């Protein structure tokens, strides 16, 4: 019988996966009370900094602290490169799809997607019809939600193009991990993410036909 979930840290025989071994040794050597204390410190620091989130659909707008998990999601570089290429390919396809919908609508004419499914959708913007965008770049940012089945195969749960939230939480969570657990980063080669704001700026600039446009993020 196939496994109903994928254990990121241990394989089916209960053996620690190679890319988690260093972390497993650190975790085994760290007293539980020390982990609990650092978790409380993280909650306090997030609270003081006002780093919270609101659940969609919550009419009261109740703000909640970011759930801080000391167990990291560790992905080997070779595995991540495959995921990265797949995400890039997917976002390119989605931009081509949007460019077609707002221009020739070949995908509708070919009967692949019913016209009413697009034209009657509340997110369809009739004012965008026929409007040419520089480099046909409709989605500058994509929040691709990934899941894994019991065998460890990655699947895309959904593509968040309209409201791709979560990047700021990722950046703040990494800062918190580096502040509370610097020894983990000293022992392993962890890919940096602090250059994300520069990547975002470059992406937004590239969507303009001007050489050096002003960029405002609302």
Regions found by a protein language model. Name each.
Residues 1-218:
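Preference for protein termini
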């Amino acid at each position: 019988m196939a496994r109903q979930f994928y254990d990121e840290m241990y394989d089916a025989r209960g053996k620690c996966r190679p890319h988690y071994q260093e972390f497993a040794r650190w975790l085994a050597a760290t007293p539980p009370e020390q982990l609990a204390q650092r978790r409380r410190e993280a909650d306090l620091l997030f609270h003081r900094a006002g780093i919270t989130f609101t659940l969609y659909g919550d009419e009261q707008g109740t703000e909640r602290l970011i759930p801080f998990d000391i167990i990291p999601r560790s992905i080997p570089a070779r595995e991540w490169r495959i995921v990265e290429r797949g995400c890039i390919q997917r976002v390119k396809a989605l931009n081509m799809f949007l460019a077609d919908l707002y221009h020739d609508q070949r995908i509708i004419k070919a009967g692949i997607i019913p016209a009413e499914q697009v034209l009657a959708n509340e997110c369809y913007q009739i004012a965008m019809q026929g409007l040419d965008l520089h480099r046909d770049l409709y989605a500058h940012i994509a929040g691709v939600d990934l899941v894994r089945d019991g065998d460890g195969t990655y699947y895309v749960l959904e593509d968040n193009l309209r409201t791709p939230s979560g990047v700021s939480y990722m950046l703040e969570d990494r800062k918190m991990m580096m502040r509370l657990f610097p020894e983990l980063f000293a022992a392993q080669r962890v890919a940096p993410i602090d250059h994300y704001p520069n990547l975002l700026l470059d992406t937004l600039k590239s969507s303009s036909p001007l050489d050096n446009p002003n960029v405002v993020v609302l």
